[in-house]
Amino acid sequence: MHFIFFGPSSGDAAERVKAAFTAVRSTGNFNWTFIFILAVVFYVYWTEIKNKNWDALIAGVALYSVHWLYEIMNAVIGYATGYPLWCVSADSTTFILLIGVSWELSMMFSMAGIISYKMLGDNPDKLIINKGKFKISMRLVGAIGMALLFALIESFLAGAENGAFIWVYPWWGVILVFITTYIPFFLAANYVPKFKPKAKKIFLLTLVGINILLLAFLIPFGII
């Protein structure tokens, strides 16, 4: 296992993707870790609800909603071109939700926003740099830092010998993952809780609604 910075992640990446397409939403690899992971997510969210940590909850839902929109678009790309930007293998998971996301990954992302927001500390608007008009807050630094960490972890997973995470396109890799995927994820987690109440509702309800509509339309038609 080693870091991969650009695709393809292996010599047989294209064949691994084709195999993964046949395993989407198959229960052939199901095991009981599925239930345990779900229980952990429930515990985390209900603990935040009990403690009335609404901003942390909003951060979690914001990132998770963006995550699902990205996964849907990635699956559409896979349907249209034959190869998604990223893909998970059937050998590495109990259940593939969409071509680019396994159950385990999705549940991790459901908690990633909460983790990111909590790491900002008691004063997320603290200015790390404050020089005249040039100001950088902890929210931005935290988002970039988490995005970099997750991009490096994905690079590591892409180098897994069992093809756990697959990149096919030679131009797709850690730099684009960092900039186009993880920075938006963690910007949503760190900044949406700061929105005014009406803006929060509009952002979350719109994104959740779009995701539900896309899933309800695209899955029955066999597109994703």
Specify the residue positions occupied by each region the protein language model found.
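Aromatic-rich, lipid-facing transmembrane alpha helices and their immediate juxtamembrane interface loops
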Residues: 1-224
